[in-house]
């Protein structure tokens, strides 16, 4: 089949892992000769990379898909793909709901997109949701940025939080080898990328599934050692990582982050609830006291560290007193960013079957109250930036003001300042902060730090 001047469009829902998967699948499509189309209505292949963490994200997918399914009646050569977590969860049921679909593929099959599409082009309707070993990516991803990049270090999750569908749809933990991770990072350094975010659903579990143990009996490979191993990759100026689990977040890792200058002093560590009974019901494997000790240890080693987190309100059986324990934790810690959600029952999870579900009214009320407090604390934390000089990695032009560029501080705060994107993109610029807002900063450029050439 010829693919000259044929176009594709990918719409991505959900987490950073999905965004990284979409970049890899875009790379596969471009290797096959397809060109990107910003407008899905001009595309010959439309791929929805989906999220099932909450019901509203899942329903949005069906809304988008319905519009394109109607289009296919007039354009039968249109290829429709649902990838990601909804595809994995629903499998062949998706074909019954949307018979116009050509390909349903779970996240473990992202690197197999070419083979799956070739089967579709041969006239088959394909479902690929079986559990497989994730093959190393042999295709260069089409990355959305030329400055920052995602690098997967571990796929899947072995945790069994009672509210979470991720282990069901992303499979068991599969760690990449340190050499494969470093090789990808070295190539990114040669291409001029400056910042890499190492990704995993539970990144602190890295290496547990790889062979080998030390003489002391611990796993031969672990995430802390990986940070030391990749820290000196030429050309890479910054390292971030996500997402962490409090159960596995160690003082040794904290110490490494404090010692390694390229590691950004920003930590995303979900706590989900500030109440121990709820944490036990969620099967999170830690207490709020342990979570607080982790944050205290981070701030002891790195007093100015930026901390972000996730929290759930309205978990089955949550009492007002238990919810207030979550409010107290947020008040006491003071997060730099707080992602919140009302509990959403997900198919195949234990908590979805419990008979102590809360009303939507209670969940909505608690979500509003938590957001109000969280935003107040974020605004308080932002005030410390005023008048300081922060180093900002310039990523792009401010879409709302063409005279400004934008980037992020070491602590992951979005920052705007005057400048020419053609001169500054990918540069580290010292910026004096002159205006603070809860979620962003504005400043004046002071000095451009010249990166060491690769």
Swiss-Prot record:
Phylogenetic classification of the source organism: Bacteria, Bacillati, Cyanobacteriota, Cyanophyceae, Nostocales
Cofactor note: Binds 2 [4Fe-4S] clusters. One cluster is coordinated with 3 cysteines and an exchangeable S-adenosyl-L-methionine.
NAD among keywords: no
Summary of the function given for this chain in its UniProt record: Catalyzes the methylthiolation of N6-(dimethylallyl)adenosine (i(6)A), leading to the formation of 2-methylthio-N6-(dimethylallyl)adenosine (ms(2)i(6)A) at position 37 in tRNAs that read codons beginning with uridine.
Any single GO BP term: tRNA methylthiolation
Protein name: tRNA-2-methylthio-N(6)-dimethylallyladenosine synthase
Major localization class: cytoplasm
Name of the encoding gene: miaB
Gene Ontology CC entries for this record: cytoplasm
All copies of domain Radical SAM core, residue ranges: 143-381
The keyword 4Fe-4S belongs to this UniProt entry's keyword annotation: yes
Naturally occurring in which organism (per UniProt): Nostoc punctiforme (strain ATCC 29133 / PCC 73102)
MTTase N-terminal domain segment(s): 6-122
